[in-house]
Amino acid sequence: VYRCDNDVVDHQVVAMEFENGIAATLTMTAFTPRLTRTVRVMGTKGMIEGDLEQCTVTLQPFGGEAQTFSAEVLGANAYGHGGGDVGLMHDFVLQVRGGGEGRTSAKQSLESHLMAFAAEQARVSGAAVELAAFERSL
């Protein structure tokens, strides 16, 4: 891996500012001692941590006691992305069959993908990307 033309991102920090003034950052790093995905969402009242290997979600209110919940819905070996791929396909098929609204709308999915593509554009160009202008350029 160190002697090839590997240009896969191994560490990235994305800073975003939304129209309503809310700021968010995303940090992705490949350098961890565990071969799993973890998610940490920090808010004003506490944080939420998810661990795909352990199939747990921990709620930690600031100044309060942490609560850990089992998130093993599809089982520990639920295929790609901790069962997320199966869940996405299940939700998609239900929507196509007319089974109602999904967990996220097509508009929300498009917006999240545009943010990811804009973050990649910013990484490659080394410049900040304004999302509306980026979307118009596509």
Q: Where do the language-model regions lie?
A:
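Short, P/G- and charge-enriched loop/turn segments at secondary-structure junctions
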Residues: V1-C4
